């Protein structure tokens, strides 16, 4: 089991990372409202020991890095008089998804949360997310589902395996440009969503996310409108936690995919420009999208510095980003 050296981040909000005056709270009231829909966050009455056993009984696992975290669906059980609201495990269809610490890789929840916040900082829409303390003090990652409304009504959300008739075990097959063409086919705002898609692919490469496979992109049904690219989810810097990872992305940008164990590497500015223009984005717009992310570096570093990562991981993450941003300069 990984022994975590927790960062001393007392009096910091687990949603926005900023200071909290009240030492008894983990969130600002306005931050709790954004994530949980209530001004006081619910309690999570589980720890790693008992939640791992529950996860084995209930939820999926996969061979990907993201999959080493058990994922549990939760709902808020409203407390009675003088009792706190609690998050309880409900099986597959809860309104929240929880990812506790991994026994193999340290700081996965903290890495996923800071990466999601970095995506938001550069204009990428993300699902509502944050960190939450378990009853033993460990941090877990929590996100609110976007495929249902406040009443529990469910909306259709189809991932790229479903939209391209791929089996789940084939989620790494193909190329990103094929997914862009699928978006054009089904989205009500095809070129806007293609642009958003390539921004997310580019961000994933910059941040060392080599696990953005077909199931990590979805189209979400918006009532009275139609399908649009969903907010981003499952953003994790895989290369930060797995030093033996040989791929820079989950799939190539162009072509029909790769065979065998051929590494997916050697991306640079021209690689992304070519992929975007072949998808119908003009050269000028593609170049601006790249510059936009290059200019986010200082924002990203400020978020990393205020995060719950260890000092060592903070420096490693910034170094990884700098290395990739250098390859994007004209």
Where do the protein language model's features map onto the residues?
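Anionic ligand-binding catalytic core segments
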Residues: 1-214, 218-330
């Amino acid at each position: 089991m990984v022994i975590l050296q927790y960062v001393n981040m007392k009096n910091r909000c687990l949603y926005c990372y900023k200071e909290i005056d009240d030492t008894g709270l983990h969130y600002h009231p306005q931050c709790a409202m954004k994530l949980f829909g209530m001004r006081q966050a619910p309690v999570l009455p589980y720890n790693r020991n008992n939640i791992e056993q529950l996860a084995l009984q209930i939820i999926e696992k996969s061979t990907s890095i993201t999959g080493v975290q058990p994922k549990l669906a939760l709902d808020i059980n409203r407390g009675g008089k003088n009792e706190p609201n609690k998050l309880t495990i409900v099986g597959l269809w809860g309104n929240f998804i929880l990812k506790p610490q991994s026994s193999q890789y340290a700081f996965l929840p903290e890495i996923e949360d800071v990466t999601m916040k970095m995506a938001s900082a550069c204009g990428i829409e993300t699902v509502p997310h944050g960190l939450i303390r378990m009853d033993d003090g460990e941090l877990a990652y929590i996100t609110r589902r976007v495929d249902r409304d406040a009443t529990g009504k469910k909306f259709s959300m189809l991932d790229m395996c479903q939209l391209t008739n791929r089996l789940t075990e084939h989620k790494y097959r193909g190329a990103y440009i094929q997914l862009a063409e699928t978006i054009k086919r089904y989205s009500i705002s095809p070129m806007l969503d293609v642009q958003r898609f390539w921004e997310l692919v580019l961000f994933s490469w910059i941040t060392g996310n080599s696990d953005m496979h077909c199931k990590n992109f979805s189209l979400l049904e918006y009532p009275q409108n139609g399908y649009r690219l969903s907010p981003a989810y499952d953003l994790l810097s895989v290369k930060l936690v797995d030093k033996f990872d040989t791929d820079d992305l989950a799939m190539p940008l162009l072509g029909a995919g790769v065979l065998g164990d051929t590494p997916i590497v050697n991306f640079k500015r021209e690689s992304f420009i070519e992929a975007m223009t072949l998808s119908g984005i003009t050269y000028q717009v593609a170049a601006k999208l790249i510059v936009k992310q290059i200019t986010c570096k200082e924002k990203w570093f400020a978020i990393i510095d205020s995060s719950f990562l260890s000092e060592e991981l903070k420096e490693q993450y910034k170094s990884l980003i700098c290395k990739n941003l250098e390859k994007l300069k004209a």
